[in-house]
Amino acid sequence: MTFEKVGVIGAGAWGTALAQVAARAGLAVTLQAREPEIVAAINDTHENAVFLPGIALEPGIKAVADLADLADCDLILAVAPAQHLRAALTAFAPHRKAGAPVVLCSKGVEQGSLKLMTDVAAEALPGAPIAVLSGPSFAGEVARNLPAAVTLACEDEALGRAIAEAIAIPTFRPYTANDLIGAEAGGAVKNVLAIACGIVEGKGLGRNAHATVITRGFAELTRLAVALGARPETVAGLCGLGDLVLTCSSPQSRNMSVGLALGQGLTLEQALAGKVSVAEGVASAPAVRALARKVGVEAPICEAVAAILAGEVAVDAAIAGLLSRPLKPEA
């Protein structure tokens, strides 16, 4: 199976960066944006000044506003924010070319339903071949052609290889897997943990505490993913541990920057003020907490972040609660 035309749903930073990758791979790229001004700017100036300012876009990228304009695309990258993915895919469903696979590139748990993105896609696009792309990949670096590697998970392994081969370039390496739940669970939970790491930084609690949050957070991530049906070796790869380390280690991370502001004493409203791109962890935190409770998984760091974001507990009290937990075996 080969692909020639790629449609990208969502022209935020990550969607635009993936459009860059696909264009560099020699594919014809149609990038859909809801905002008419972004469509016009990309087509006229070859720049997404709102989400990726200062980065020249590949000439092979064409921007559109109407999802119907993706009807001739034989591969779809769905990059709408997690809480808007269902609406985007439902609107796109009548226009999907028969047999066109849909690669889910959004990370999160849907509020209310507590569904992962593959479940959302299966309901919005019945019968569509689904894959998941996830891994340590800041959009700005990918768009500037700096090296990155990701997980491309698809139950149909031949299809997964075909998609990986279609979008791979020397600076963007997709490693294939067949564990969709593992690929997406890691990406959903790591955003919540990145907020926790940001809080640690904002409070000045030191590198020891930072490393502890990453490590114990990864234990929470793994427990939840396995309870949902993932294999532990999947979340130990790029889509889980790799993405967690990146997102928890740089203020470039939208989620970590929110936590940093909270740790410095700002309110959530102040922390989010002026942010153009979505910090998925803010929306996913209550859903991750509810999902962990539903499947009986202990996730104290995710619980604390969700409680802080909901205004149920102050930052200092949440930290004190974590530090006073009973001692237990590490495993």
UniProtKB/Swiss-Prot annotation:
Catalytic reactions on record: sn-glycerol 3-phosphate + NAD(+) = dihydroxyacetone phosphate + NADH + H(+); sn-glycerol 3-phosphate + NADP(+) = dihydroxyacetone phosphate + NADPH + H(+)
Domain of life according to the entry: Bacteria
Keyword DNA repair in record: no
Pathway connected to this protein: Membrane lipid metabolism; glycerophospholipid metabolism
Main location group: cytoplasm
First-level EC class: oxidoreductase
Gene Ontology MF term list: glycerol-3-phosphate dehydrogenase [NAD(P)+] activity; NAD binding
Subcellular locations according to the entry: Cytoplasm
Cross-referenced Pfam families: NAD_Gly3P_dh_C (PF07479), NAD_Gly3P_dh_N (PF01210)
Gene Ontology annotations for the cellular component aspect, listed alphabetically: cytosol
Assigned keywords, A-Z: Cytoplasm, Lipid biosynthesis, Lipid metabolism, NAD, NADP, Nucleotide-binding, Oxidoreductase, Phospholipid biosynthesis, Phospholipid metabolism
Binding site for sn-glycerol 3-phosphate: K107, G135, S137, K190, D243, S253, R254, N255
InterPro entries: 6-PGluconate_DH-like_C_sf, 6PGD_dom2, G3P_DH_NAD-dep, G3P_DH_NAD-dep_C, G3P_DH_NAD-dep_N, NAD(P)-bd_dom_sf
Active site: K190 (proton acceptor)
EC number per UniProt: 1.1.1.94
Annotated positions binding NADPH: W14, R34, K107, A139, R254, V278, E280
Family: Belongs to the NAD-dependent glycerol-3-phosphate dehydrogenase family.
Role: Catalyzes the reduction of the glycolytic intermediate dihydroxyacetone phosphate (DHAP) to sn-glycerol 3-phosphate (G3P), the key precursor for phospholipid synthesis.
Protein name in UniProt: Glycerol-3-phosphate dehydrogenase [NAD(P)+]
Gene, per the UniProt record: gpsA
